[in-house]
Amino acid sequence: MVITFSSMKGGVGKSTDAILLANNLAARGFKILFFDMDTNNSSTIYYTMGIADEFPTQNVAEALTRRTTEGYTVKSRIPNIDIVPSSLRLFDIRSIDYHALKKTLPDVEYDFVVIDTAPTYDNLVMNALYAADCILTPVQLDFFNLTTSRFLRAHLYDELSEQVGKWFMYYTFWQESHELFPNSVQSQFARIFEKEFSNILECIQVPKTPATMKYTQTDEKVSVRSRLLGSQRLAVAFNRLANLVTQTETQKDENGNEIFPVDRF
């Protein structure tokens, strides 16, 4: 299964979310190929810390040019995850045919391919959208995200209509306390989004929490049993998302609390 994270709006946590989902799936025992198509390089840096600073020959640009991942993957520092590192050479191949990535990805060997894309819309992003079995767009509830979500929807319908049914959105930077106030900016934009888009995963609310930065910057794990509310909510959100993509039914204990395959990741 190929999962593409795509958002034209930068700063919504797209790369971190891709990492969190990939790590949760890997912790469940699935074999993951992480394909970093974002020239910001943050996912590559996260997965290859302590391995190498640059990958001049093993990278996404070389893989796309030669239409194969064989010889271009790197074993990451996280068990069960290999990565095709990002490269600034992506700028040189922006005119590449949008079928290239689909021809490049391996048919077997991995349970999931997770693709991180740049916050833009070009042929490289089209490659990632076209290759996807599931497209995930994190949205922060504001006017800028509404505008870019409309833009992405229009381009999907115009250029990749067969992928529209595979596209889903979910809320990020969610503040649970604001749910109590119907006139809060969050609540008002949630109503606008839900009126205009029918593809919102309302059960996925990625919280606004320092635990997100700690996860990628200090390797501090998140846990559904954490005493820190932010860590707990982050772990729950990505367990729910992992359950959706793996089609795993969420179980509950006798008190109605959700039970997940992975407590800590």
Residue map of PLM features:
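P-loop NTP-binding core
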Residues: 1-265
